[in-house]
Amino acid sequence: MKVIIVNGSNNSGKDQFANFFNKHYEHKSVNWSTIDKVKKILKRNFGWNGKKNNESRLFMSEMKRIWSEFNNGPFEDMVTKISKYNANLPKSERQNIVYFIHCREPHEIQKFVDKYGKKCLTVLLKREDREVANNDSDKNVANYEYDFYIDNNGDKKELEKQVLEFIEKIKAS
């Protein structure tokens, strides 16, 4: 099992990176975010239409911050989700599954690194043409020392090539 924290500014290619990984990795991988539950709450209880803009990003960031300060909820929720998912896998799949976890905040990333140790890797996708959003989650994306840095300034074929190289690196680790 590996937990890969994938990060980057908005629209930096995090989902595309995980999708290419899933396409080429011979074992199972899943792609989740620590903000998923907050998004569901916003849609169900606050009328959010699912479209991301500066206002909705700020709202999500603040809700996640409050939940984290209240009871470490985003982290604990994801740890529980990983544990339950892993328990339901056949034993033969548990060793090689990869959990992509989107997490923006450096202090939250560190919680995963502390919990999963050598099973946890961190990746930052960087794009030169991306504007940083107006919230603390997005503003602090670069304030962490990641294990891997992916420059996503080319086309999708270039990103896919980098994903293939990344897969080889993690197989060797």
Where are these regions (language model features)?
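ATP-dependent NMP and nucleoside kinases share a basic, alpha-helical "lid"
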Residues: 80-140
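ATP-dependent small-molecule kinase phosphotransfer cores
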Residues: 33-98, 104
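Extreme N-terminal starter segment of soluble prokaryotic enzymes
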Residues: 1-4
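Small-molecule kinase domains that catalyze NTP-dependent phosphoryl transfer to phosphate-bearing small molecules
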Residues: 114, 121-173
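P-loop (Walker A) phosphate-binding loop of NTP-binding proteins
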Residues: 9
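Post-Walker A helix-loop "phosphate-sensing" segment adjacent to the P-loop in P-loop NTPases
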Residues: 23-31
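Conserved lysine of the Walker
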Residues: 14
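Hydrophobic positions on the alpha1 helix immediately C-terminal to the Walker A/P-loop
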Residues: 17
